[in-house]
UniProtKB/Swiss-Prot annotation:
Subunit composition and interactions: Influenza RNA polymerase is composed of three subunits: PB1, PB2 and PA. Interacts (via N-terminus) with PA (via C-terminus). Interacts (via C-terminus) with PB2 (via N-terminus); this interaction is essential for transcription initiation.
Reactions accelerated catalytically: RNA(n) + a ribonucleoside 5'-triphosphate = RNA(n+1) + diphosphate
Entry keyword Lipid metabolism: no
The organism's place on the tree of life at top rank: Viruses
The protein's name: RNA-directed RNA polymerase catalytic subunit
Major location (coarse): host cell
Gene Ontology cellular-component annotations: host cell cytoplasm; host cell nucleus
Subcellular location(s) per record: Host nucleus; Host cytoplasm
Residue stretches making up the RdRp catalytic domain: 286-483
PTM text: Phosphorylated by host PRKCA.
């Protein structure tokens, strides 16, 4: 039967049709090769936007630096980074006038957090630039390496201390004449394989000590490593993102804590909240503008876009903002917060891996590392790359480029939001003192501007004034990419507003389906995604039921666990059929064991094991949840786990799901190929670390430590604890005399070994 598709929309309000416009099927684009070119683009563009600033030279590192602050006011619409200090300070003052006490309260909250935060805060986060190895590492490893080096250089670094104490060490490290670090290197040699008699390359990892003088250390401490941003849709060109090292991270964290606290108190801020809370907050601002506009007034909304937000922001401006916000606070607090922007004013961008060259005729490939770009003959490069390198050369030092202006992506999202909101705040009638007024929403570089005025000329004047005010603080609204419409229809941070925020369900489509973690987690994540979309994204009951059936089908095909009574033949069907026949209560079998699906849209919140527990055969229960089952590497499973789901737009989201430990919650083993790389030493360190921590937690089950505090104290603690426990157990008759004697002997041996060492 032919269906006329327009009939489907007869009863649907126009705004609900947004889900049919979904363009993002298929995989997003990923980047390959080096990010060196993109990073050079960023550095060159940033300098171009500030080119009329003043050049100075950093006395410590010798890096040339460009300072556009209080530079010439722009004469055209080109993006520029010439923020005016007095304008920024005035915007801050007006923001405080509109929200009495906001800065002081936020400072008090932050001060409390600064004094309580422990150093492990820095282990959160993904890849981090590890200055000791000069490349990226997982955050925890980078922190451990930094602390190790600090300690061997006579600083008091302590892994379980306060973050503020670690930051004191960072400050001291910058005053040292030199720092000694341990780096990893690899040796390659050709050997003959005994088995295959072929020649193979063997790699061995060595560690060597290296001394960095003050200048080299400072360059590394101020370095941001760069990578290419992956999985960005709707862009032809890739772009670079930055990852700072451990010296900068702690300071940035405190600044962002302060800014977050301020953003929470500003109704125009789209950060730090998200989801429905954000929609409610934003809908409020729109409602306010609609109700306050008299019947005769016009109201227009701009769906705004800023040109190169990060590259025109300036850390020196952030320093001015922080100086103002904390002006009534104690000296130590002001100092701690001002270090991050100062470090960013002196930052260096690491150019990444360099360029790959290949000669098709000679079948040769060679890599030109970034360090060589300063001296290599440019005749090997094509024209566009040659231009980039020529432009960046004056800024190069040791494979990094001096980048004083600009912020790099994702660094001070909260603080830059405060700056944006301070301009929106100036739109109140009592400040504009004319017939037009504005308000709006700001979330990092994304904004929506609502302008009210008696007539079109007033609207135009309001927009112009907003545009020019933004220019004064280094914000460049893009006239080409911003769109104005009658208030009631606009887009902000991928939320579409049409008389209320419209649920764009299609955005969530990529996160439906089977993740491939393990049978247990996948089942749980799958139903949670459907449940969440019923709550948040207008996923109706009929569609949800269909999504559920499709999910179960997908799940069964992924794990080849079709029902025990099916005709489908897979590699697993023999075992599953046998299990089906032996099971009395077939409804109790999990779907992953060939059982029926008992989920419907009413019970999505119950983990499958709980849902079927009463229906299971007793011996099946015993096998399924047997912690001693030798085939399962049981990690300790928290009652709630986190999964990463990929919506179509925006960053990967973390989503909670219920975790029940069964024989299906297996953990895949680590890929062996890492054992042949330079990461191997790190892997071994990590495993040692893990073993020590596990052992420690066995002795101190209530241990709130996550990591050892200096090796000696740890061993001593465990030995003395073992002795106490053994004596108690012996006296209460839980262990025999021989066992007690043996434990005591082992303890003495350990102490003896430590003395000899």
């Amino acid at each position: 039967m032919d269906v006329n598709p327009t009939l489907l929309f007869l009863k649907v309000p126009a705004q609900n049709a947004i889900s049919t416009t979904f363009p993002y099927t298929g995989d997003p684009p990923y980047s390959h090769g080096t990010g060196t070119g993109y990073t050079m683009d960023t550095v060159n563009r940033t300098h171009q936007y500030s080119e009329k600033g003043k050049w100075t030279t950093n006395t410590e590192t010798g890096a040339p630096q460009l300072n556009p602050i209080d530079g010439p006011l722009p004469e055209d619409n080109e993006p520029s980074g010439y923020a005016q200090t007095d304008c920024v300070l005035e915007a801050m003052a007006f923001l405080e006038k509109s929200h009495p006490g906001i800065f002081e309260n936020s400072c008090l909250e932050t001060m409390e957090i600064v004094q309580q935060t422990r150093v492990d805060k820095l282990t959160q986060g993904r890849q981090t630039y590890d200055w000791t190895l000069n490349r990226n590492q997982p955050a925890a490893t980078a922190l451990a390496n930094t602390i190790e080096v600090f300690r061997s250089n006579g600083l008091t670094a302590n892994e379980s201390g306060r973050l503020i104490d670690f930051l004191k060490d960072v400050m001291e490290s910058m005053d040292k004449g030199e720092m000694e670090i341990t780096t990893h290197f690899q040796r390659k040699r050709r050997v003959r394989d005994n088995m295959t008699k072929k020649m193979v390359t063997q790699r061995t990892i060595g560690k060597k000590k290296q001394r960095l003088n003050k200048r080299s250390y400072l360059i590394r401490a101020l370095t941001l490593n760069t990578m290419t941003k992956d999985a960005e849709r709707g862009k032809l060109k890739r772009r670079a993102i930055a990852t700072p090292g451990m010296q900068i991270r702690g300071f940035v964290y405190f600044v962002e804590t302060l800014a977050r606290s301020i953003c929470e108190k500003l109704e125009q801020s789209g950060l730090p909240v998200g989801g429905n809370e954000k929609k409610a907050k934003l809908a409020n601002v729109v409602r306010k503008m609609m109700t306050n506009s008299q019947d005769t007034e016009l109201s227009f909304t701009i769906t705004g876009d800023n040109t190169k937000w990060n590259e025109n922001q300036n850390p020196r401006m952030f320093l001015a903002m922080i100086t103002y916000i904390t002006r009534k606070q104690p000296e130590w607090f002001r100092n701690v917060l001002s270090i991050a922007p100062i470090m960013f004013s002196n930052k260096m961008a690491r150019l990444g891996k360099g360029y790959m060259f290949e000669s098709k005729s000679m079948k040769l490939r060679t890599q030109i590392p970034a360090e060589m770009l300063a001296s290599i003959d440019l005749k090997y490069f094509n024209e566009s790359t040659r231009k980039k390198i020529e432009k960046i050369r004056p800024l190069l030092i040791d494979g990094t480029a001096s980048l004083s202006p600009g912020m790099m992506m994702g660094m001070f999202n909260m603080l830059s939001t405060v700056l944006g909101v301070s301009i929106l705040n100036l739109g109140q009638k009592r400040y504009t003192k004319t017939t037009y007024w504005w308000d709006g929403l700001q979330s990092s570089d994304d904004f929506a501007l609502i302008v009210n005025a008696p007539n079109h000329e007033g609207i135009q004047a309001g927009v112009d004034r907003f545009y020019r005010t933004c220019k004064l603080v280094g914000i460049n609204m893009s006239k080409k990419k911003s769109y104005i419409n009658r208030t009631g229809t606009f887009e902000f941070t991928s939320f579409f507003y049409r008389y209320g925020f419209v649920a764009n369900f299609s955005m969530e489509l990529p996160s439906f389906g089977v993740s491939g973690i393990n049978e247990s987690a996948d089942m749980s994540i799958g139903v949670t995604v459907i449940k969440n979309n019923m709550i948040n994204n207008d996923l109706g009951p009929a569609t949800a039921q269909m999504a559920l059936q499709l999910f179960i089908k997908d799940y069964r095909y992924t794990y080849r666990c079709h029902r025990g009574d099916t005709q489908i033949q897979t590699g697993r069907s023999f075992e599953l059929k046998k299990l089906w026949e032996q099971t009395r209560s077939k409804a109790g079998l999990l779907v992953s064991d060939g059982g029926p699906n008992l989920y419907n849209i009413r019970n999505l919140h119950i983990p499958e094991v709980c849902l079927k527990w009463e229906l299971m055969d007793e011996d099946y229960q015993g096998r399924l949840c047997n912690p001693l089952n030798p085939f399962v590497s049981h990690k300790e499973i928290e009652s709630v786990n986190n999964a990463v789901v990929m919506p179509a737009h925006g960053p990967a989201k973390s989503m909670e799901y219920d975790a029940v430990a069964t024989t299906h919650s297996w953990v895949p083993k680590r890929n062996r190929s890492i054992l042949n790389t330079s990461q191997r030493g790190i892997l071994e360190d990590e495993q040692m670390y893990q073993k020590c921590c596990n052992l420690f937690e066995k002795f101190f089950p209530s241990s709130s430590y996550r990591r050892p505090v200096g090796i000696s104290s740890m061993v001593e603690a465990m030995v003395s604890r073992a002795r106490i426990d053994a004596r108690i157990d012996f006296e209460s008759g839980r262990i025999k005399k021989e066992e007690f004697a043996e434990i005591m002997k082992i303890c003495s041996t350990i102490e003896e070994l430590r003395r000899q060492k």
